[in-house]
Amino acid sequence: MQAVEEIRALSKRLNSSIVKTVGLTQSISDVCRNMKQFNDIDVTLNIDETTIDKLTQEQQLVVFRIIQEQSNNIIKYSRASATTISLTEKNNQCCLIISDNGIGFDKAKQKPSGIGFINIFNRIDAYNGKVEINTFPDNGCTLNITIPYIL
């Protein structure tokens, strides 16, 4: 088990430099390709490059980390066969939407309190952004995230 944790830590360090080196779009595309190749989850990807251009390097890394985290949640818990990742601009803010067609959950009974969700909320909080989770049992899960641009 320790070896797995060490590999994950190494992977995160490498991915940080990958976003800087190959860019956010390619980094996200790699996550999507892995979801399909290793987990047979169809991914629809919608990225507006002008939105990415308005994000700082740090914000781009935050977006990438959130996509990684939610992709892991989808793989581990959702039993989804398809997911959509959309990165666009809305109301002069970055808008990230990640949705799946999985089993969803009842937020009233099962609060999103895992370390993955906590990390997502903390990352967005640091940029005065907002996270909204829309989910119902047997109806998938959608994360709606907004991040203000830094001027």
Give the ranges of each region predicted by the language model.
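Coiled-coil dimerization/phosphotransfer module
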Residues: 1-151
